[in-house]
Amino acid sequence: MLTADIRRIAPQTPAAPAPDRAPEWVAAGTPEPLRAGLIEALGKDRVLTRALDLVKYASDASPYRLIPRAVAMPHDTDDVVKLVRWASRTRTPLVFRAGGTSLNGQSQTDSVLVDVRQHWQRVRVLDGGARVRAQPGMLLGHVNRLLARYGRKLGPDPASSDIACVGGVIANNSGGMRCGTWADPYSTVSSMTLVLASGAVIDTAAPDAEERFASAAPELANGLERIRDELRADRELSERVASKFKIKNTMGYRLCAFLDADRPLEIFRRLVVGSEGTLAFVAEAVLDTVPFGRHASVALVPFEDIDAAADAVAPLVAAGASATELMVAPTLIAAAHNMPGTPERWKTLRPESAAVLVEFRADDPDSLDAPEQAALEILAGRAVIDEPRFTRDRDEIEMLWHVREGMHGLLAAVRPSGAALIVEDVCVRPERVAEAAKDLQAVLGKHGFLPGLAGHASAGNLHFMLMLDFGKPEDLERYDALIHDLADMIVGKYDGSLKAEHGTGMNMAPFVEREWGPKATELMWQIKQLADPEGILGPGIVLNREPGVHLRNLKSTPEIEEVATKCIECGFCEPVCPSRNVTTTPRQRIAVRREMARQPPDSPVRQALLEQYEYEAIQTCAADGSCAAACPVAIDTGKLVKALRVRQHRAPATRAGALAANHFGALERVARAALRLGGGLAARASRRALPAAAPSQLPFTVREGAAAVYLPACLNRIFGNGRDSAVHPTVPEALVAVSRRAGRPVWIPSDVAGHCCGTPWSSKGYTTGQQLMAGRVASALHRWSDGGRLPVVIDASSCAYGLLDEVGADGIEVLDSIAWVHDHLLDHLEVRHRLGTVVVHPNCSGTHLGLSSKLAAIAARLADEVEIPAATGCCGMAGDRGWLHPELPASALRNVARELDGRSFDACVSSNRTCELALEQVTGRRYSSFVIALEEATRD
């Protein structure tokens, strides 16, 4: 009776089943003999075949949706070799996917999808940061955090850097806001380890690589030499190719490789960049890095019109601007109405005006003075609306870049129900960007679309977005008409690129010949045939002779729960989700939910998804809200999951939750006794190492003269500080001591036992129990604080966040221990025992409270060096969920453990006991509260 009832979480029945719903065969999973063949080739643990597996991989950031028949999960290069050889024998197409942020359908298939993210996350910094060696599943943002200490970064910097993976960036030849053609993957990839369609493995950096390539793939090598000679002999075509690639261009294959390299393998290595996984698999790449100044100065300069804005770009670039981003007035006006913090005056901008976001970067602040002054002189006398003002304030800079990078989320927030977003990008020669922008606005207006544009002005690269409901035939016709007019304008008038940075994909494959002409396109078809004679690598993704393929397999977006219905499936949530390498991500939880909503109530697919959703989506969700911070429209998928947990509880479970709330004081005593008497048994039962019990008595304090009320979290009232409590103080002992030492003593009420923030109930969906506890704690806080006269300090960030989020604590100041120490104690304490290096883990709740920088500042007072691992994120513990599902923290923290491996530190600190326990278990290092480290460092 206490088990979940999955029938209670079935979505609302649609008025009519969606035309693009998953077919009934999906209910049984991967069909035979495909399933058996894949398992034989790779092994059962490397193949996903259930209904939920297929549906969760059907969606990516593009407007397309194809349901794969199976998902392969290779762990290493040997697995990929086995996979491509099996695919070649069976003529089974493969499509590789890393981050799933591609926008044009290039990571979509109805055959076998190959996940090269989950087990492909190794990276190594080389030559003092001058180069990096990375696997395809490594996040760009993670690599850049590792490089930051060297003042370097990867060249490509797409807006999706925090979720885009190295493999996808190379596959699409992605660019970005500060990335010209000189810094894109084509220019910065120095070597690769490739798996050819035959299964041959070639390291292009090996001394004998050319010879091995010629031996392993003689027809390919000879064919590339033939095409090289043919292209070079055709002066008109070779000049056109050279000209086309002077600007950003990701349409088709990079024929410039035949002009830039002489030998077959070097030509092929260059062709693989931007080939979208259709010529070979990149198992590893070495990339050159570029310098990146640690300090920035930014201004958003509004101009009277687009011409004036564009005219200022070249001089600003000559003055050293690292970025010059063009935004037209409709974009800024929409931002002003929908983005908090944007200037009020943007709402009244004239429609014909435009703005340029200008950024300068330098290694030290003084070096920004000269370019700032040069920029002001350049802008003086031009048709600017407001006097230009540069800022170096991090918060202001973040807001300005948020406007530029937040276009995706901005339109998602106002997206009509059922509409999808399509992101387009084109490129023209930079000197014609103003003219092209006006023409593009006219084309958009002609077809009834918002004429909002933004782009990398110095590169002539313009981006725009479309909102369409593909369930409406008129929207499909409108989109098709727009694309054809766009092609006529960009290619016919400007000889530009129909895709500058986003890759070709099924969205633009039908238009490759329109841009390149029959002769160049035929050479591309020859390249594909030479590299992939069996046609197993992403067929139809870059080259496709089927007209209208860009109008097929467009996904519907059925309404689901309000908290998640605005999701555009961009995937920005995925890197911060602790279950991303175990079960599902927030994007996938929502995508599967939408598939349920597409199905009729008696559908076997719906039933299969409901049954599998319980563990895959509900039980293994940490519900910590990290996804909301990363999401462009602030969707907290944890709230969706918690709402589903409430719905699936039967009455006996709800009563049990209320009973626990009413007798929580007794439960505390039982828990401590269990830890003292049966810690070993409990650890074995939970498959986790448990700490010692906390002392039965809390430290002695008095109310008189207290500067704050101290509510020790139930975590710290139950769990002690590990098995070395005799050596180190407990958290309550340490906080009482440092508060007294700083002249700000705290008082612990004698009746704190039995009081809790309520998070254990709300996170599990026990609403009645949470309400009971919330009422009790709110009353106690009011009484203890003398009606709000004294602040209340709590020593676990999740509990502080819970009190503020769940209880509300109206009129009472609730302070996390980080804020208490940083704002009230730190300046009154003397560090007498300084540490060398301290590792800091900012946990989810502290991050939500905006306290991560304060935690780092406290650590900086204690130590010569503070390190926050580049892989830091949610630990996956989520209260007790990590004990119930130890696979969560084990997976969430694996990259942190790798980063710390083999190094020594004086202390590892955080601000939440269960997070510290998870970190200890996975990394093998002792983690404790920062308060303990502070107390020990400030002792006499």
What do the PLM-derived regions correspond to, one by one?
Residues 1-85, 89, 101-130, 207, ...:
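N-terminal flexible segment immediately upstream of the FAD-binding catalytic core
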Residues 535-541, 572-595, 620-647, 802, ...:
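Iron-sulfur cluster-binding cysteine motifs and their immediate structural context
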Residues 543, 549, 580-616, 634-659, ...:
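Non-heme iron-sulfur electron-transfer modules
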Residues 166-261, 265-336, 350-356, 580-602, ...:
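Mobile "lid/hinge" segments at catalytic clefts and subdomain interfaces of large enzymes
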Residues 532, 637-940:
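Iron-sulfur cluster-binding electron-transfer modules in prokaryotic oxidoreductases
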Residues 512-514, 549-569, 600-623:
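Ferredoxin-like iron-sulfur electron-transfer modules
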Residues 38, 62-94, 112, 116-159, ...:
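N-terminal glycine-rich flavin-associated loop
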Residues 48-57, 257-265, 269-481, 489, ...:
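C-terminal substrate-recognition/cap domain of FAD-linked oxidoreductases
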